[in-house]
């Protein structure tokens, strides 16, 4: 039996695992959220995000790639029309996993995996970043000017001290004579 690419095997065979993940992805896209065990949710997340990325492309080849995994045409239609439009501004992170109380029957760690449908507040973040960059640029010349003055001032003081030092040595030499 080949070793799995990521994490422990969730089912008895690779084919069963692929089918189980495909069924969970179908349910996720139909309902928007599903409750499952934490390991299954963690294994479903990369598959669901990859399928949403294909849906955002929207071309025929991407639709056929999604149809390899999700066999239900109505769910594929929902994915390409509704979900892809909701995720248009989002650059990844299409799903969210929330841990919940352990399952009652066997105390397995349970989780809810859901689609993130909140709009991205990207423009406000960009404006704040630009404002911070402007402030940093304005402060940078002031800091450089202070650093230049600080470097020049000790040079003048040491030059004055060197000029005084020979005079003091000469005075000491005269006293010694």
Swiss-Prot record:
<feature type="compositionally biased region" description="Low complexity">
    <location>
        <begin position="150"/>
        <end position="164"/>
    </location>
</feature>
<dbReference type="Pfam" id="PF01196">
    <property type="entry name" value="Ribosomal_L17"/>
</dbReference>
<keyword id="KW-0689">Ribosomal protein</keyword>
<keyword id="KW-0687">Ribonucleoprotein</keyword>
<protein>
    <recommendedName>
        <fullName>Large ribosomal subunit protein bL17</fullName>
    </recommendedName>
</protein>
<feature type="region of interest" description="Disordered">
    <location>
        <begin position="136"/>
        <end position="177"/>
    </location>
</feature>
<comment type="similarity">
    <text>Belongs to the bacterial ribosomal protein bL17 family.</text>
</comment>
<comment type="subunit">
    <text>Part of the 50S ribosomal subunit. Contacts protein L32.</text>
</comment>
<dbReference type="GO" id="GO:0022625">
    <property type="term" value="C:cytosolic large ribosomal subunit"/>
</dbReference>
<dbReference type="InterPro" id="IPR047859">
    <property type="entry name" value="Ribosomal_bL17_CS"/>
</dbReference>
<feature type="compositionally biased region" description="Acidic residues">
    <location>
        <begin position="138"/>
        <end position="149"/>
    </location>
</feature>
<dbReference type="GO" id="GO:0006412">
    <property type="term" value="P:translation"/>
</dbReference>
<dbReference type="InterPro" id="IPR000456">
    <property type="entry name" value="Ribosomal_bL17"/>
</dbReference>
<dbReference type="GO" id="GO:0003735">
    <property type="term" value="F:structural constituent of ribosome"/>
</dbReference>
<dbReference type="InterPro" id="IPR036373">
    <property type="entry name" value="Ribosomal_bL17_sf"/>
</dbReference>
């Amino acid at each position: 039996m080949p070793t799995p690419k990521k994490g422990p095997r969730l089912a008895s065979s690779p084919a069963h695992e692929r089918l189980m993940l495909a069924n969970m992805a179908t349910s996720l896209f139909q309902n928007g959220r599903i409750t499952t065990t934490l390991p299954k949710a963690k294994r479903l997340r990369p598959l669901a995000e990859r399928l949403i990325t294909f849906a955002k492309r929207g071309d025929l080849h991407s639709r056929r790639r999604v149809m390899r995994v999700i066999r239900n045409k109505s769910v594929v239609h929902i994915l390409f029309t509704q979900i892809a439009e909701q995720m248009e501004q989002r650059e990844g992170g299409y799903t969210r996993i929330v841990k919940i109380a352990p399952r009652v029957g066997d105390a397995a760690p349970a989780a809810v995996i859901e689609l993130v449908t909140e709009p991205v507040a990207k423009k406000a973040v960009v404006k704040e970043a630009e404002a911070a960059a402007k402030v940093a640029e304005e402060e940078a010349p002031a800091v450089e000017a202070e650093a230049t003055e600080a470097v020049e001032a000790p040079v003048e003081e040491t030059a004055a001290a060197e000029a005084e030092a020979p005079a003091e040595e000469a005075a000491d030499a005269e006293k010694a004579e």
